[in-house]
């Protein structure tokens, strides 16, 4: 049994089973960079404040920089017995530079150290996730620009409702992913403050310059209460909440991709590079990527629920339960990034079958509202017009024809308000073009929306 950094008050070593059980080095080694950055800033401040000698601070910093380089080069092996990344690095440091290494932890606890590391980690990952989201939005805007005139059916209840365009449909997702971006930014804004100096729970007797450390590490300020500084994991939960919404949006889009690429819809064809085949059925081309993203949505929701449940009812301040925050947080980060990285090129390369979309927009009485609107514009009340057109649809269903296939006499028989111009007014192109209201599907409104989204992006 190995000697622990905290072993002073113990008469016996840790049982081997316990050692394996409570060690987190297997997963928290991913925080090595943040841990070393934090330690360097802490050591520099200790030296500047005269808490340790300036030369000692220098030795520590130099030692930490070498450890960083060695970890990066794959030359460091971590030790399960040293528990976590924080103690592994401190242990290596002391092995290398001698007793002066033991001064690094002055005025610090692993509790504020780990709170710092996770914040630094998440800050970088939020930047990367935001970049991936903006890349997706850029591709959506490019594809929308191509398809401003590509008419397709819009649905409610997955029943054909009214004609829209593919561009308009894609722009709905631009809105969702735009909100996701702002949620990430907002979340980072709230947690970008340094907990170092909170100590184990009650701060420290050493005259630390918390603000200087925070500034060196790129924080906007410091946490205002030492208990909260070490026991707050709201930011991890907020991130998982934001990540869950990203996944929810991706899964809705994926569901449509899966439907649209079915033979029954045939609205799109995924590129071969983003589809897979069947081991038995030679004809198959499956939208596995979209399905897998839809499936992975569940794990990110699971990560969110796991974190909420870990934190539920924990008394202040730090409790070892909180070591369980990392694997779920890392999983959410990896999953959302992995999904975005494959979803974006899948959308960029998918082939759109405009003729199939337009054909789809034509069946199913998608212009029925336009017939009613036509009557309302000719002075019939909308409620009455709705009733008249409902009867016309019933008549069409019985005859198996579309509204535009009715003769002018048929129209007149239903309402005297119909004139010859009704046929032009209910063409599917007109149905789209006349919905010029801001936020609507008319090509000019969509072009304006693309322009506005581009401006927001830059
Ligand atoms: N590995 C620990 C964690 O991730 C670090 C903090 C440990 N603190 C303690 N008092 N045992 O939560």
Swiss-Prot record:
Pathway: Amino-acid biosynthesis; L-arginine biosynthesis; L-arginine from L-ornithine and carbamoyl phosphate: step 3/3. Its main location: cytoplasm. Keywords: Amino-acid biosynthesis, Arginine biosynthesis, Cytoplasm, Lyase. Its EC number is 4.3.2.1. GO terms for biological process: arginine biosynthetic process via ornithine; L-arginine biosynthetic process. InterPro entries: Arg_succ_lyase_C, Argininosuccinate_lyase, Fumarase/histidase_N, Fumarate_lyase_CS, Fumarate_lyase_fam, Fumarate_lyase_N, L-Aspartase-like. It comes from the Bacteria. Coiled coil: none annotated. It is found in: Cytoplasm. PROSITE patterns: FUMARATE_LYASES (PS00163). It holds the Pfam family ASL_C2. It catalyses: 2-(N(omega)-L-arginino)succinate = fumarate + L-arginine. One of its GO terms (molecular function) is argininosuccinate lyase activity. Belongs to the lyase 1 family. Argininosuccinate lyase subfamily. NCBIfam families: argH. This is Argininosuccinate lyase.
